[in-house]
Amino acid sequence: MGNGESQLSSVPAQKLGWFIQEYLKPYEECQTLIDEMVNTICDVLQEPEQFPLVQGVAIGGSYGRKTVLRGNSDGTLVLFFSDLKQFQDQKRSQRDILDKTGDKLKFCLFTKWLKNNFEIQKSLDGFTIQVFTKNQRISFEVLAAFNALSLNDNPSPWIYRELKRSLDKTNASPGEFAVCFTELQQKFFDNRPGKLKDLILLIKHWHQQCQKKIKDLPSLSPYALELLTVYAWEQGCRKDNFDIAEGVRTVLELIKCQEKLCIYWMVNYNFEDETIRNILLHQLQSARPVILDPVDPTNNVSGDKICWQWLKKEAQTWLTSPNLDNELPAPSWNVLPAPLFTTPGHLLDKFIKEFLQPNKCFLEQIDSAVNIIRTFLKENCFRQSTAKIQIVRGGSTAKGTALKTGSDADLVVFHNSLKSYTSQKNERHKIVKEIHEQLKAFWREKEEELEVSFEPPKWKAPRVLSFSLKSKVLNESVSFDVLPAFNALGQLSSGSTPSPEVYAGLIDLYKSSDLPGGEFSTCFTVLQRNFIRSRPTKLKDLIRLVKHWYKECERKLKPKGSLPPKYALELLTIYAWEQGSGVPDFDTAEGFRTVLELVTQYQQLCIFWKVNYNFEDETVRKFLLSQLQKTRPVILDPAEPTGDVGGGDRWCWHLLAKEAKEWLSSPCFKDGTGNPIPPWKVPTMQTPGSCGARIHPIVNEMFSSRSHRILNNNSKRNF
């Protein structure tokens, strides 16, 4: 293979794609010949007159998953025999029937003119078939199995219950019957993009090079690394076309975190069935690393810890090699080594600190990026005009709820040419266009220092300019949304509330037009920001946790429907805390559970605040009463009353509620001794006569026993 045998660390990052094509992928003509031979073998094995007991053939291993490396590779041929009627039948020796099958197959293949391209060799358990061309050899292990799926494409919960019963009855090892689900393994990989399989080839080749260094090292299943690579791509990218080097760095970083790795899928099984749920919870609480086979929940394919520890050192070596670490920042995908679902309740604070809280350096980087754009807007963008602007920072970094994984910033530009809500609607696209043109010119002047990538607008008359910024002083790219807006609040002094006239004008416009609620929420960015920024640190951490949960749900549910906005979940979290706790130090698991319980009760939710508007002004009062009579859920934006982020039937709350219900069985809601963690007692509905959100709930009615303990620890605090 020539240069293919050289150290991968010597291959430049930008050449990795070329390296895969040049040295790792099988030659096309060889692959075609191998495919033809394998198809012939499968056809022969399914000839009833020759092999009457064979009900079907499944192809597995690297060949079945289409992750074959050039040269020597592996595969499995799984023969479903009619006399294997249940899982435990596989515990009987299949040596005799496989011997006879191998002998007859050898004779049949000789008559098919394949004698120069295959070898059948006896083994302890049966036989292997080697299929080869000049430059490619695949060694297939032939296995006998019970056809667990029969004619079904998808496994039922019943089949996994039977699997567990059979394992217990026969004292078989977990995963021993995974071969019965070979077709599902193939299906799991079938719909993956070609470039992801290229990345898998690269990781497998690297692993082979590592193994050559220490031959006595316990071997790690290539399947485990394939699944790890799929997980990295699913969690961090999901694009058909991506940068191979970014994928490599991500997989290597995950290998470095092997003592935290916990990976599973719910494509063939989930937590709904009690037996399967118990299997999963047991597996997910096992010692790390855990990588569950997506087709068999009893099969942890992670293997021996020793090989992971050694692989960790090799991963660090490649990561820090000059060719892979050739640019700053060296980009990778943001992927956590373990899902939130598996984290016990008493460790949620640690999870937030390790994986969700941005560090000081991250926040300083965001501030630096914001200062670059803020300076551009103030000093460069409008210098050819008489325009006056005021810039307000919004978004999660301004609120204090930013996540570690994702650098973004919102800048609202109050432009003096926008003198009303209507002028904002009609004229803002011109300001967006001007900022776009001026930023492009600014970038051309600073090309050696800055890199700007613009996102295409979502609307014909754009209301926001979205772009990402890279700089020599930034460790990573920062995404920006710049939004022109009418300064509806004027010079609002700190601590004061807007006059009712501000809202009356907005309400009149909303009622006399077909504009959606919240259309002018950018005008009230300061109020939205202050509403959250002033909250206790631990509450903002709970918001981070809920946002992370939402992102996990969004990744899974987005293809099924439009989910409610993240802001709705932020407000729901604040409401849960106000009504159920109200103290700066509280039990995070209790708070998290309360939010999810409220999500499951979305059809009853009616939530509002009286911090910026209330029922005293007649116009506002009538409008609020009409808003509160809308289809549930109703969650009014505390900054402006036309924004109902609950939205009634507008969004697919039912999808989120179903997910929340499944999550209630998570270890997140068990304490250190395994006892269930209760939610706070929180009403789902407020009425105009209720106390609102500024008065803390009555302690005896609203606090759980665990919260009482926390409250006692904070007895010096005045309520």
From Swiss-Prot:
InterPro entries tied to this protein: 2-5-oligoAdlate_synth_1_dom2/C, 2-5OAS_C_CS, 2-5OAS_N_CS, NT_2-5OAS_ClassI-CCAase, NT_sf, Polymerase_NTP_transf_dom
Cellular component terms per the entry's GO annotation: cytoplasm; cytosol; intracellular membrane-bounded organelle; membrane; nucleoplasm; perinuclear region of cytoplasm
Principal location: cytoplasm
Annotated effect of mutating residue 544 to A/Y: Significant loss of activity
Effect recorded for residue 421 to P/A: Significant loss of activity
GO molecular function annotation: 2'-5'-oligoadenylate synthetase activity; ATP binding; double-stranded RNA binding; metal ion binding
Residue span of region OAS domain 2: 343-683
Similarity comment: family membership: Belongs to the 2-5A synthase family.
Subunit structure: Homodimer.
Protein name listed in UniProt: 2'-5'-oligoadenylate synthase 2
